[in-house]
Swiss-Prot record:
Protein's UniProt keywords contain Metal-binding: no
PANTHER family found in the cross-reference section: CELL CYCLE PROTEIN (PTHR30474), PEPTIDOGLYCAN GLYCOSYLTRANSFERASE FTSW-RELATED (PTHR30474:SF2)
UniProt entry tagged with the keyword Electron transport: no
Source organism phylogeny: Bacteria, Bacillati, Bacillota, Bacilli, Lactobacillales
Keywords linked to the UniProt accession: Cell cycle, Cell division, Cell membrane, Cell shape, Cell wall biogenesis/degradation, Glycosyltransferase, Membrane, Peptidoglycan synthesis, Transferase, Transmembrane, Transmembrane helix
Cellular localization per UniProt: Cell membrane
InterPro entries tied to this protein: Cell_cycle_FtsW-rel_CS, FtsW/RodA
Name of this chain's protein: Probable peptidoglycan glycosyltransferase FtsW
Function (record text): Peptidoglycan polymerase that is essential for cell division.
Source organism per UniProt: Lactococcus lactis subsp. lactis (strain IL1403) (Streptococcus lactis)
EC number: 2.4.99.28
PROSITE patterns assigned: FTSW_RODA_SPOVE (PS00428)
A Pfam family of this chain: FTSW_RODA_SPOVE
Membership in a protein family: Belongs to the SEDS family. FtsW subfamily.
Membrane topology: Multi-pass membrane protein
Length: 420
Protein backbone atom coordinates (compact mmCIF):
# COMPACT_ATOMS: atom_id res chain seq x y z
CA UNK A 1 0.00 0.00 0.00
CA UNK A 2 1.27 3.47 -0.93
CA UNK A 3 1.63 5.51 2.27
CA UNK A 4 3.05 8.58 0.54
CA UNK A 5 2.03 11.70 2.48
CA UNK A 6 0.60 13.36 -0.63
CA UNK A 7 -2.13 10.71 -0.69
CA UNK A 8 -3.42 11.87 2.70
CA UNK A 9 -3.80 15.60 2.11
CA UNK A 10 -6.97 16.71 3.92
CA UNK A 11 -8.89 18.68 1.31
CA UNK A 12 -11.69 19.41 3.77
CA UNK A 13 -9.17 21.68 5.53
CA UNK A 14 -7.22 22.94 2.51
CA UNK A 15 -10.15 23.90 0.24
CA UNK A 16 -12.03 26.09 2.79
CA UNK A 17 -8.71 27.78 3.60
CA UNK A 18 -8.09 28.53 -0.09
CA UNK A 19 -11.66 29.81 -0.56
CA UNK A 20 -11.32 32.18 2.39
CA UNK A 21 -7.92 33.34 1.14
CA UNK A 22 -9.41 34.09 -2.28
CA UNK A 23 -12.33 36.00 -0.78
CA UNK A 24 -9.81 37.87 1.36
CA UNK A 25 -7.89 39.12 -1.69
CA UNK A 26 -11.13 40.32 -3.30
CA UNK A 27 -12.25 42.13 -0.14
CA UNK A 28 -8.83 43.69 0.50
CA UNK A 29 -8.91 45.00 -3.07
CA UNK A 30 -12.44 46.34 -2.56
CA UNK A 31 -11.67 48.06 0.76
CA UNK A 32 -8.21 49.50 0.05
CA UNK A 33 -8.47 50.92 -3.48
CA UNK A 34 -10.72 53.93 -2.61
CA UNK A 35 -8.52 54.96 0.34
CA UNK A 36 -5.32 54.59 -1.69
CA UNK A 37 -6.79 56.72 -4.50
CA UNK A 38 -7.83 59.43 -2.03
CA UNK A 39 -4.27 59.53 -0.70
CA UNK A 40 -2.80 59.68 -4.21
CA UNK A 41 -1.04 56.35 -3.76
CA UNK A 42 -0.82 53.25 -5.95
CA UNK A 43 -4.34 51.77 -5.61
CA UNK A 44 -3.06 48.22 -6.07
CA UNK A 45 -0.15 48.35 -3.62
CA UNK A 46 -1.89 46.87 -0.57
CA UNK A 47 -3.68 44.11 -2.45
CA UNK A 48 -0.42 43.18 -4.20
CA UNK A 49 1.30 43.01 -0.79
CA UNK A 50 -1.52 40.86 0.57
CA UNK A 51 -1.35 38.54 -2.43
CA UNK A 52 2.41 38.21 -1.95
CA UNK A 53 1.93 37.21 1.69
CA UNK A 54 -0.71 34.67 0.67
CA UNK A 55 1.62 33.13 -1.90
CA UNK A 56 4.37 33.04 0.73
CA UNK A 57 1.92 31.31 3.07
CA UNK A 58 1.21 28.63 0.46
CA UNK A 59 4.93 27.97 0.08
CA UNK A 60 5.27 27.76 3.87
CA UNK A 61 2.36 25.31 4.06
CA UNK A 62 3.93 23.12 1.35
CA UNK A 63 7.27 23.06 3.19
CA UNK A 64 5.79 22.32 6.63
CA UNK A 65 3.48 19.67 5.17
CA UNK A 66 6.51 17.78 3.85
CA UNK A 67 8.25 17.81 7.26
CA UNK A 68 8.24 14.65 9.30
CA UNK A 69 6.17 15.03 12.44
CA UNK A 70 9.14 14.43 14.71
CA UNK A 71 10.62 17.70 13.42
CA UNK A 72 7.58 19.55 14.79
CA UNK A 73 8.06 17.79 18.15
CA UNK A 74 11.67 18.94 18.57
CA UNK A 75 11.58 20.55 22.01
CA UNK A 76 14.89 22.37 21.61
CA UNK A 77 13.63 24.05 18.45
CA UNK A 78 10.33 24.97 20.11
CA UNK A 79 12.15 26.41 23.13
CA UNK A 80 14.50 28.44 20.92
CA UNK A 81 11.58 29.86 18.92
CA UNK A 82 9.77 30.85 22.13
CA UNK A 83 12.85 32.70 23.40
CA UNK A 84 13.22 34.54 20.08
CA UNK A 85 9.52 35.41 20.14
CA UNK A 86 9.63 36.84 23.66
CA UNK A 87 12.78 38.83 22.89
CA UNK A 88 11.22 40.25 19.72
CA UNK A 89 8.13 41.35 21.68
CA UNK A 90 10.30 43.00 24.33
CA UNK A 91 12.38 44.62 21.58
CA UNK A 92 9.23 46.14 20.07
CA UNK A 93 8.16 47.54 23.44
CA UNK A 94 11.34 48.94 24.94
CA UNK A 95 12.87 50.62 21.90
CA UNK A 96 12.16 54.36 21.64
CA UNK A 97 9.37 55.56 19.33
CA UNK A 98 11.92 57.33 17.15
CA UNK A 99 13.69 54.05 16.38
CA UNK A 100 12.80 53.30 12.76
CA UNK A 101 12.57 49.52 13.11
CA UNK A 102 9.96 49.66 15.89
CA UNK A 103 8.05 52.88 15.18
CA UNK A 104 4.46 52.70 16.52
CA UNK A 105 1.54 51.86 14.25
CA UNK A 106 -1.75 53.50 15.31
CA UNK A 107 -0.28 54.11 18.75
CA UNK A 108 0.75 50.49 19.39
CA UNK A 109 4.36 49.30 19.61
CA UNK A 110 4.01 45.71 18.39
CA UNK A 111 5.51 45.99 14.91
CA UNK A 112 8.99 45.49 13.51
CA UNK A 113 9.62 47.40 10.28
CA UNK A 114 11.67 45.40 7.78
CA UNK A 115 12.96 47.50 4.85
CA UNK A 116 11.65 46.29 1.51
CA UNK A 117 9.13 43.91 3.09
CA UNK A 118 6.94 45.96 5.40
CA UNK A 119 5.90 45.44 9.00
CA UNK A 120 5.90 42.19 10.96
CA UNK A 121 3.82 41.79 14.13
CA UNK A 122 5.34 39.11 16.40
CA UNK A 123 2.12 38.82 18.45
CA UNK A 124 0.32 37.33 15.44
CA UNK A 125 2.79 34.45 15.44
CA UNK A 126 2.68 34.17 19.24
CA UNK A 127 -0.90 32.90 19.03
CA UNK A 128 0.19 29.81 17.08
CA UNK A 129 3.54 29.38 18.84
CA UNK A 130 1.72 29.24 22.20
CA UNK A 131 -0.32 26.31 20.85
CA UNK A 132 2.81 24.60 19.57
CA UNK A 133 4.67 25.17 22.86
CA UNK A 134 1.84 24.00 25.13
CA UNK A 135 1.16 20.96 22.93
CA UNK A 136 4.80 19.99 23.35
CA UNK A 137 4.68 20.50 27.13
CA UNK A 138 1.36 18.80 27.87
CA UNK A 139 1.86 15.86 25.49
CA UNK A 140 4.93 14.78 27.49
CA UNK A 141 3.05 14.99 30.80
CA UNK A 142 0.09 12.75 30.00
CA UNK A 143 0.88 10.10 32.65
CA UNK A 144 1.46 12.76 35.32
CA UNK A 145 -1.73 14.64 34.38
CA UNK A 146 -3.70 11.40 34.54
CA UNK A 147 -2.38 10.77 38.07
CA UNK A 148 -2.36 14.29 39.55
CA UNK A 149 -4.97 16.01 37.35
CA UNK A 150 -4.88 19.83 37.51
CA UNK A 151 -2.22 19.73 40.25
CA UNK A 152 0.26 18.67 37.57
CA UNK A 153 -0.68 21.63 35.36
CA UNK A 154 -0.21 24.14 38.18
CA UNK A 155 2.62 22.39 39.97
CA UNK A 156 4.56 24.34 42.59
CA UNK A 157 5.17 24.69 46.32
CA UNK A 158 4.08 28.33 46.55
CA UNK A 159 1.31 30.33 44.88
CA UNK A 160 3.97 32.25 42.92
CA UNK A 161 5.43 29.02 41.56
CA UNK A 162 1.97 27.71 40.69
CA UNK A 163 1.19 30.84 38.66
CA UNK A 164 4.58 31.73 37.16
CA UNK A 165 6.80 28.66 37.45
CA UNK A 166 7.73 26.10 34.81
CA UNK A 167 5.82 26.24 31.52
CA UNK A 168 3.71 29.16 32.76
CA UNK A 169 6.56 31.69 32.77
CA UNK A 170 6.87 32.11 28.96
CA UNK A 171 3.08 32.33 28.59
CA UNK A 172 2.74 35.00 31.29
CA UNK A 173 5.72 36.91 29.85
CA UNK A 174 4.10 37.03 26.40
CA UNK A 175 0.76 38.11 27.87
CA UNK A 176 2.25 40.93 29.93
CA UNK A 177 4.49 42.31 27.19
CA UNK A 178 1.69 42.13 24.63
CA UNK A 179 -0.76 43.88 26.97
CA UNK A 180 1.51 46.90 27.46
CA UNK A 181 2.25 47.25 23.71
CA UNK A 182 -0.71 48.04 24.02
CA UNK A 183 -2.49 45.15 22.24
CA UNK A 184 -5.59 44.12 24.17
CA UNK A 185 -7.07 41.98 21.40
CA UNK A 186 -4.17 39.61 20.88
CA UNK A 187 -3.58 39.45 24.64
CA UNK A 188 -7.13 38.21 25.20
CA UNK A 189 -6.86 35.72 22.34
CA UNK A 190 -3.55 34.30 23.61
CA UNK A 191 -5.02 33.97 27.11
CA UNK A 192 -8.12 32.23 25.73
CA UNK A 193 -6.00 29.86 23.63
CA UNK A 194 -3.88 28.99 26.68
CA UNK A 195 -7.06 28.15 28.62
CA UNK A 196 -8.30 25.98 25.74
CA UNK A 197 -4.98 24.12 25.72
CA UNK A 198 -5.20 23.55 29.47
CA UNK A 199 -8.69 22.14 28.98
CA UNK A 200 -7.45 19.82 26.24
CA UNK A 201 -4.39 18.72 28.22
CA UNK A 202 -6.15 15.80 29.87
CA UNK A 203 -7.39 17.34 33.12
CA UNK A 204 -10.74 16.13 34.40
CA UNK A 205 -13.84 17.78 32.99
CA UNK A 206 -15.09 18.92 36.42
CA UNK A 207 -12.08 21.21 36.83
CA UNK A 208 -12.23 22.67 33.35
CA UNK A 209 -15.99 23.07 33.42
CA UNK A 210 -15.83 24.77 36.80
CA UNK A 211 -13.12 27.23 35.80
CA UNK A 212 -14.82 27.96 32.46
CA UNK A 213 -18.11 28.76 34.17
CA UNK A 214 -16.29 30.99 36.66
CA UNK A 215 -14.47 32.92 33.92
CA UNK A 216 -17.62 33.35 31.81
CA UNK A 217 -19.55 34.51 34.87
CA UNK A 218 -16.87 37.07 35.75
CA UNK A 219 -16.87 38.33 32.15
CA UNK A 220 -20.66 38.74 32.20
CA UNK A 221 -20.49 40.59 35.52
CA UNK A 222 -17.73 42.83 34.17
CA UNK A 223 -19.67 43.72 31.01
CA UNK A 224 -22.72 44.47 33.14
CA UNK A 225 -20.58 46.65 35.40
CA UNK A 226 -19.43 48.62 32.35
CA UNK A 227 -23.02 49.61 31.60
CA UNK A 228 -23.44 50.85 35.18
CA UNK A 229 -20.28 52.99 35.36
CA UNK A 230 -20.24 54.10 31.72
CA UNK A 231 -16.98 52.48 30.62
CA UNK A 232 -14.36 54.79 32.11
CA UNK A 233 -12.82 52.40 34.64
CA UNK A 234 -9.08 52.10 33.85
CA UNK A 235 -7.00 54.36 36.18
CA UNK A 236 -4.94 57.03 34.39
CA UNK A 237 -1.62 55.80 35.82
CA UNK A 238 -1.86 52.49 33.93
CA UNK A 239 -0.41 52.20 30.38
CA UNK A 240 -3.68 50.78 29.01
CA UNK A 241 -6.06 53.73 29.46
CA UNK A 242 -6.82 53.58 25.72
CA UNK A 243 -9.18 50.73 26.62
CA UNK A 244 -11.55 53.22 28.27
CA UNK A 245 -12.59 54.62 24.87
CA UNK A 246 -13.43 51.13 23.64
CA UNK A 247 -15.45 50.47 26.78
CA UNK A 248 -17.33 53.76 26.31
CA UNK A 249 -18.11 52.86 22.69
CA UNK A 250 -19.32 49.43 23.77
CA UNK A 251 -21.74 50.97 26.30
CA UNK A 252 -23.18 53.45 23.76
CA UNK A 253 -21.30 54.39 20.56
CA UNK A 254 -23.78 57.15 19.71
CA UNK A 255 -22.92 59.36 22.70
CA UNK A 256 -19.55 60.30 21.18
CA UNK A 257 -19.82 59.79 17.43
CA UNK A 258 -16.81 61.99 16.68
CA UNK A 259 -14.40 60.02 18.86
CA UNK A 260 -14.85 56.80 20.84
CA UNK A 261 -18.06 55.69 19.11
CA UNK A 262 -17.06 56.57 15.55
CA UNK A 263 -15.92 53.12 14.43
CA UNK A 264 -18.68 51.07 16.02
CA UNK A 265 -21.47 53.42 14.89
CA UNK A 266 -20.23 53.30 11.29
CA UNK A 267 -19.92 49.53 11.57
CA UNK A 268 -23.63 49.46 12.40
CA UNK A 269 -24.39 51.72 9.44
CA UNK A 270 -22.46 49.39 7.11
CA UNK A 271 -24.41 46.34 8.27
CA UNK A 272 -27.76 48.14 7.98
CA UNK A 273 -26.83 49.46 4.52
CA UNK A 274 -26.07 45.93 3.35
CA UNK A 275 -29.31 44.34 4.43
CA UNK A 276 -29.86 40.73 3.39
CA UNK A 277 -28.40 40.84 -0.11
CA UNK A 278 -25.88 43.72 0.01
CA UNK A 279 -25.20 46.74 -2.17
CA UNK A 280 -22.96 44.77 -4.51
CA UNK A 281 -19.24 44.06 -4.57
CA UNK A 282 -17.27 47.32 -4.52
CA UNK A 283 -20.32 49.47 -3.71
CA UNK A 284 -19.76 50.01 0.01
CA UNK A 285 -20.35 53.56 1.24
CA UNK A 286 -18.72 53.22 4.66
CA UNK A 287 -15.30 52.22 3.31
CA UNK A 288 -14.97 55.63 1.64
CA UNK A 289 -13.46 57.32 4.68
CA UNK A 290 -16.37 56.80 7.08
CA UNK A 291 -15.25 53.54 8.72
CA UNK A 292 -11.58 53.58 9.83
CA UNK A 293 -9.63 50.30 9.48
CA UNK A 294 -12.24 49.00 7.03
CA UNK A 295 -9.65 46.66 5.51
CA UNK A 296 -8.50 45.16 8.84
CA UNK A 297 -10.50 45.18 12.09
CA UNK A 298 -13.81 46.10 10.43
CA UNK A 299 -13.66 44.18 7.18
CA UNK A 300 -16.62 41.99 8.16
CA UNK A 301 -19.12 44.92 8.27
CA UNK A 302 -17.90 45.90 4.78
CA UNK A 303 -18.41 42.30 3.64
CA UNK A 304 -22.00 42.49 4.91
CA UNK A 305 -22.54 45.91 3.33
CA UNK A 306 -21.38 44.67 -0.08
CA UNK A 307 -22.45 41.01 -0.01
CA UNK A 308 -25.30 41.23 2.47
CA UNK A 309 -26.09 39.32 5.63
CA UNK A 310 -26.45 36.20 3.47
CA UNK A 311 -22.91 36.67 2.14
CA UNK A 312 -21.60 37.16 5.67
CA UNK A 313 -23.35 34.01 6.86
CA UNK A 314 -21.87 31.99 3.97
CA UNK A 315 -18.35 33.18 4.85
CA UNK A 316 -18.89 32.33 8.52
CA UNK A 317 -20.24 28.91 7.48
CA UNK A 318 -17.09 28.20 5.45
CA UNK A 319 -14.93 29.23 8.40
CA UNK A 320 -16.92 27.15 10.88
CA UNK A 321 -16.73 24.15 8.54
CA UNK A 322 -12.93 24.53 8.50
CA UNK A 323 -12.87 24.78 12.30
CA UNK A 324 -15.11 21.73 12.71
CA UNK A 325 -12.97 19.58 10.39
CA UNK A 326 -9.83 20.36 12.39
CA UNK A 327 -11.64 19.81 15.68
CA UNK A 328 -12.87 16.38 14.53
CA UNK A 329 -9.31 15.34 13.62
CA UNK A 330 -8.16 16.56 17.04
CA UNK A 331 -10.83 14.62 18.92
CA UNK A 332 -10.10 11.41 17.00
CA UNK A 333 -6.30 11.73 17.12
CA UNK A 334 -4.37 8.89 18.74
CA UNK A 335 -1.39 11.10 19.61
CA UNK A 336 -1.72 13.64 22.45
CA UNK A 337 0.54 16.10 20.62
CA UNK A 338 -1.56 15.85 17.46
CA UNK A 339 -4.80 16.23 19.38
CA UNK A 340 -3.56 19.30 21.26
CA UNK A 341 -2.37 21.05 18.10
CA UNK A 342 -5.63 20.45 16.23
CA UNK A 343 -7.84 21.52 19.14
CA UNK A 344 -5.61 24.55 19.73
CA UNK A 345 -5.68 25.79 16.13
CA UNK A 346 -9.43 25.26 15.78
CA UNK A 347 -9.93 27.01 19.13
CA UNK A 348 -7.76 29.92 18.02
CA UNK A 349 -9.81 30.47 14.87
CA UNK A 350 -13.08 30.19 16.80
CA UNK A 351 -11.98 32.69 19.46
CA UNK A 352 -10.56 35.14 16.92
CA UNK A 353 -13.67 35.20 14.74
CA UNK A 354 -15.84 35.66 17.83
CA UNK A 355 -13.70 38.54 19.12
CA UNK A 356 -13.58 40.24 15.70
CA UNK A 357 -17.26 39.87 14.78
CA UNK A 358 -18.38 40.40 18.38
CA UNK A 359 -16.52 43.71 18.47
CA UNK A 360 -17.85 44.76 15.05
CA UNK A 361 -21.49 44.20 16.05
CA UNK A 362 -21.10 45.48 19.61
CA UNK A 363 -21.74 42.40 21.72
CA UNK A 364 -18.25 42.75 23.26
CA UNK A 365 -15.84 45.73 23.36
CA UNK A 366 -13.86 46.22 20.14
CA UNK A 367 -10.31 44.89 20.49
CA UNK A 368 -8.59 45.53 17.17
CA UNK A 369 -8.06 41.95 15.96
CA UNK A 370 -8.37 40.82 12.37
CA UNK A 371 -10.98 38.58 10.77
CA UNK A 372 -9.24 35.25 9.97
CA UNK A 373 -7.95 35.08 6.37
CA UNK A 374 -10.05 38.03 5.14
CA UNK A 375 -8.49 41.10 6.77
CA UNK A 376 -5.52 42.86 5.24
CA UNK A 377 -2.35 42.07 7.16
CA UNK A 378 0.57 39.88 6.22
CA UNK A 379 1.54 38.86 9.76
CA UNK A 380 -2.01 37.83 10.63
CA UNK A 381 -2.39 35.76 7.47
CA UNK A 382 1.04 34.14 7.83
CA UNK A 383 0.48 33.35 11.50
CA UNK A 384 -2.90 31.69 10.95
CA UNK A 385 -1.58 29.90 7.85
CA UNK A 386 1.15 28.43 10.05
CA UNK A 387 -1.63 26.89 12.12
CA UNK A 388 -3.23 25.49 8.95
CA UNK A 389 0.15 24.04 7.92
CA UNK A 390 0.44 22.23 11.26
CA UNK A 391 -3.14 21.01 10.91
CA UNK A 392 -2.57 19.58 7.42
CA UNK A 393 0.64 17.84 8.50
CA UNK A 394 -0.98 16.32 11.57
CA UNK A 395 -4.17 15.32 9.73
CA UNK A 396 -2.08 13.45 7.15
CA UNK A 397 -0.05 11.78 9.90
CA UNK A 398 -3.19 10.59 11.69
CA UNK A 399 -4.76 9.29 8.48
CA UNK A 400 -1.58 7.53 7.39
CA UNK A 401 -1.23 5.93 10.81
CA UNK A 402 -4.83 4.73 10.67
CA UNK A 403 -4.40 3.24 7.19
CA UNK A 404 -1.12 1.60 8.20
CA UNK A 405 -2.70 -0.01 11.27
CA UNK A 406 -5.64 -1.29 9.22
CA UNK A 407 -3.28 -2.67 6.59
CA UNK A 408 -1.19 -4.45 9.21
CA UNK A 409 -4.32 -5.81 10.87
CA UNK A 410 -5.73 -7.29 7.66
CA UNK A 411 -2.33 -8.61 6.57
CA UNK A 412 -1.91 -10.50 9.83
CA UNK A 413 -5.47 -11.85 9.75
CA UNK A 414 -5.36 -13.27 6.20
CA UNK A 415 -4.96 -17.09 6.45
CA UNK A 416 -2.21 -18.81 4.50
CA UNK A 417 -2.65 -22.25 2.87
CA UNK A 418 -0.06 -24.86 2.08
CA UNK A 419 -0.15 -26.58 -1.29
CA UNK A 420 -1.71 -30.04 -1.22
Amino acid sequence: MNLNKNNFLNYSILIPYLILAGIGIVMVFSTTVPDQLQKGLNPYKLVINQTAFELLSLIMIAVIYRLKLRALKNRKMIGTIMVILILSLIFCRIMPSSFALTAPVNGARGWIHIPGIGTVQPAEFAKVFIIWYLASVFSTKQEEIEKRDINEIFKGKTLFQKLFGGWRLPVVAILLVDLIMPDLGNTLIIAAVALIMIGASGISWRWYSGYSKLILSLMAIFLGFLFIVGGNIIPSFLPITYINKRFEAFVNPFTDLANSGHQLANSYYAIVNGGWTGRGLGNSIQKNGFLPEAQTDFIFPIVVEELGIIGGIIILAILFFLISRMLIVGIRAKSAFNSLIMIGVSGLLLVQVFVNVGGAIGIIPETGVTFPFLSQGGSSFLGLSLGIAFALNISADEKRREVSELSNHYSSSVPTYEND
